[in-house]
Amino acid sequence: GLKLFAEIDHSAEAEAAGLKLPPTVVFIFGNPAVGTMLMQANNAVSLELPLRLAVYRDAGLGCTVLSYHAPSSLAHQFALDDHLKVQAIVSKMDALLADICTTVANDQR
């Protein structure tokens, strides 16, 4: 299952530093077993794991934005495109992140 490793409230930290920042939070999460399989294929991918999801208020757009790097981009970035097992894993990770964002967006309506 998924594990939440950290929640970083950048706007609270900005306020503590005497600065202003619209609501901005980053969630760091993942499944250690899945991440380990990716790192076994190329340990350098550890730089990008666990996954991160940024949630912030964009005043210009007038809405809340959810932003993340697609796990499938990691396969290309770390030369894992030829690993069929990795492709299956990152496809599932892409779908998971899309599902999370869809669920959050639907809950906000």
List the predicted regions and their residue ranges.
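Feature detects long, helix-prone N-terminal segments enriched in hydrophobes
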Residues: 1-109
